[in-house]
């Protein structure tokens, strides 16, 4: 369907967010005539979301910007079960304490994108543990479980993937689909919520909730999914050679976050500007026309705009300036990520492989060795060819720092502590 009446669907369509909608005309009509409450679920499986989940946060952002009410549902209850959708194996179960700690950490990110409060379209953050932990199992089976067909649940692609590979799917995980469907109904009852959004891998789970709502007498519920994004080269969003691109500042610096977006492939620039920034579409179209070396200016704008939304404009501009000094002027900027190494350790000397791991440029000595042997590692801009090299205080420059580099884009300053 094209020519949406509602600002929300029109915005999402123009920017490339929409993969599938359960009832386009019905949802469009509803959004055009009243304030709609909608939610997306987030699993607290780590202390931070990563950039792969940013598209979902942006959907909630545009929902609020077009006059509707966003709800971020934290899976404090379902997080203890684990979503089996398109996973190759069962996920490690998490304790209540770990989930609570992760939720508290994740909450900080949402305040950068959404306005929370008591207004008509102010955002809410809700924990499904509030109702799931108090369920009476026998009553739940009688009132909710009877509405689910096991035959139909087995037909979902997310389940078939595991079964076709002859991999175990526990009863615990199988129940996740029922619990997520129940969330939709419970949120409708508590907050009048009518729309659930998510990635395209969640389609089956969301439709389950719509069907359950129909059987339990809720008003018409709706589903909207976004595409599962990969880069032009097929890499998953939110991952890099150095690991996950975390959204929390205490897990990834604003500079490293900026660099991730600066390194966007040429073919992805226009798409990412539409999805991850709030720049006007005509400005994005202008930037998309840039070619050759000029495309790098569009990448810098992308990096700065995405970083500004998450970390603030000052941090984004500082990251951009640090990159300019480092890569264009050849200066050693003190705004680069810094790692302290005990003076005694530097005096005695530390192996370059261990230093790479300590600086979080690599996760293992083996990975660091491969980078050294591949010629990707430099100390103070001098190539390192021997993985047995020992780095000591003699490498400190006039500023009392050691510049450790992996490739052309990743740099860390080593400072005696």
UniProtKB/Swiss-Prot annotation:
* Binding, L-tyrosine: 39, 176, 180
Question: Which CDD domains does the record cross-reference, listed alphabetically?
Answer: S4, TyrRS_core
Q: Which chemical reaction does it catalyze?
A: tRNA(Tyr) + L-tyrosine + ATP = L-tyrosyl-tRNA(Tyr) + AMP + diphosphate + H(+)
Indicate the principal place this protein occupies in or around the cell: cytoplasm
Which ranges belong to the motif 'KMSKS' region?
A: 236-240
The region annotated as signal peptide is none
- What does the protein in this record do? Catalyzes the attachment of tyrosine to tRNA(Tyr) in a two-step reaction: tyrosine is first activated by ATP to form Tyr-AMP and then transferred to the acceptor end of tRNA(Tyr).
Q: Which family does it belong to?
A: Belongs to the class-I aminoacyl-tRNA synthetase family. TyrS type 1 subfamily.
Q: What is this protein called?
A: Tyrosine--tRNA ligase
Species per Swiss-Prot/TrEMBL record? Brucella abortus (strain 2308)
In the record, what lineage is assigned to the organism producing the protein?
Bacteria, Pseudomonadati, Pseudomonadota, Alphaproteobacteria, Hyphomicrobiales
